[in-house]
């Protein structure tokens, strides 16, 4: 069964809005912001794959693989930074990390 492109794009839009809401609502928690960004990137990946399926091109799948590689690198680096900052400040509150020494 082939899913219509409109349904795929509606689902991608809903996922993107949910990810954006997650980023905007939990601005103080770095881990929740990271989860929201990942949801938004997955929505973009779904839109690419749906469009590629509609037009019969492999470009969407290639972009999806690139997004998967980029997000895995992003998550590993971001979580390493969060663990480091949590060890130093004992919190994951983003407002605590914006203070500069000076």
UniProtKB/Swiss-Prot annotation:
Signal peptide: none annotated. GO terms for biological process: ATP synthesis coupled electron transport. It catalyses: a quinone + NADH + 5 H(+)(in) = a quinol + NAD(+) + 4 H(+)(out). Its EC number is 7.1.1.-. It is an enzyme of class 7 (translocase). The chain crosses the membrane at residues 5-25, 30-50, 62-82. NDH-1 shuttles electrons from NADH, via FMN and iron-sulfur (Fe-S) centers, to quinones in the respiratory chain. The immediate electron acceptor for the enzyme in this species is believed to be ubiquinone. Couples the redox reaction to proton translocation (for every two electrons transferred, four hydrogen ions are translocated across the cytoplasmic membrane), and thus conserves the redox energy in a proton gradient. This is NADH-quinone oxidoreductase subunit K 1.
